[in-house]
UniProtKB/Swiss-Prot annotation:
Tree of life domain: Bacteria
Protein name: 5'-nucleotidase SurE
Enzyme class: hydrolase
Binding site for a divalent metal cation: D8, D9, S39, N91
Keywords tagged on the record: Cytoplasm, Hydrolase, Metal-binding, Nucleotide-binding
NCBIfam families assigned to the protein according to its UniProt record, in alphabetical order: PRK00346.1-3, PRK00346.1-4, surE
SUPFAM superfamilies reported in the protein's UniProt record: SurE-like
Listed InterPro entries: SurE, SurE-like_Pase/nucleotidase, SurE-like_sf
Cofactor binding, note field: Binds 1 divalent metal cation per subunit.
UniProt family annotation: Belongs to the SurE nucleotidase family.
HAMAP family assigned to the protein according to its UniProt record, in alphabetical order: SurE
EC identifiers of the protein: 3.1.3.5
Organism: Pseudomonas fluorescens (strain SBW25)
Amino acid sequence: MRILISNDDGATAPGLAALYAALEDYAECVVVAPDQDKSGASSSLTLDRPLHPKVLANGFISVNGTPTDCVHLAINSLLDHEPDLVVSGINLGANLGDDVLYSGTVAAALEGRFLGRTAFAFSFASRQLDNLPTAAYFARKLVEAHATLDLPPRTVLNVNIPNLPLDHIRGIQLTRLGHRARAAAPLKVVDPRGKEGYWIAAAGDAEDGGEGTDFHAVMQGYVSITPLQFDRTFSDAFSGLDGWLEGLR
């Protein structure tokens, strides 16, 4: 088995190293990841300059681009054989609810959809490293079990692991995406030369975080697995739009 591993925290991120270490004796793993932190890059592609892959001392390949660039380039140019699986992470910080719209971790997994196979996006609900081995354990466990999955093509499994020791994890739950409240306003700052700028503020708190959501599962000590699809068509809106268009013809 061949696994393509990527992330959005960058090629030197501890979560990426932990994921590789968890999988390297299970499959032939190739790591292609951004050369710097690209959190929040979503599914953006770099179109204004060429991409330059660089092989690092540990064998990982870094690219001066986004997570989507990395997977796109790896599948279409860098690899001699297509991978059997695309795995992204381990992100330091959860990707819950609306986070998936912005997450480079999820985007890297989504780019693997062209293979027509299931892909995984793994996120750990902390930026502290003490319990990162818990996330690595579940990444290995779920990847090992993926061969028995019977899912529609191009399914992405968004996995969030609580910041807990392994023996404190209560189990695994299948969840839906929750929703966040509106984020705080960007923070206005002034640099030493008097030039004004803005920092994007933290994401909003969970607004829809009840039972059954990814928010609730992680808060209750469960690993959350949410199946995602690329098709964002809002089918329920068709009937209302049909009537609206009739009046415009």
